Amino acid sequence: MRLPYSSSKPIPTNNNNNNNNTNNGISINKIPKSHYSYYQTQENNKPQQSQQHPLLQHQQQQQQQQQQQQQQQQQQQQQQQQQQPQQQPQIATITATISISPSINNIIVNNSPIKTPSKKHRSSSKKSPSSSKKLNKVLSCCFVCQSSISNPFIVKETPKANHYFCSIQCFAQASP
């Protein structure tokens, strides 16, 4: 429906930005209220979501299902990671419960040899006062190590039988 206007007069343009009641020079107030309210109710009665093509709806549903499946998989992976114990080596302080035996055959030099008397035919179960002194000296050298279950602390005799070195490198995980 066109609004009547005189063809001899040019259509006024809206050069005044402060006038909020005009649209392209035509005042909104000139539209009859009955028509305006009719258009307004038609706009309000429109459905909120435009109906999509069934193929588009199907694709969107598939995408949503895939996203949900991915989220579920991520949650399951996180739960599995939480359930599995961490298998990274832990740092443990060496304690005096470690027994030193000549049968242990690995050493890493810590730049500080410890001179101790050596007994070649000593069993690991017997502990003499000299072995406890030896243990204390070696422990004073080796302060922190990654401990293992079988050999928390690895030491061997050097070619010179009266020298021991402390080990800082260990090879397995800490015992629980």
UniProtKB/Swiss-Prot annotation:
Region of interest (Disordered), residue spans: 1-88, 109-132
Low complexity bias (residue ranges): 13-24, 47-88
SUPFAM superfamilies on file: beta-sandwich domain of Sec23/24
Protein name in UniProt: Uncharacterized protein DDB_G0288467
Biased composition (Polar residues): 1-12, 37-46
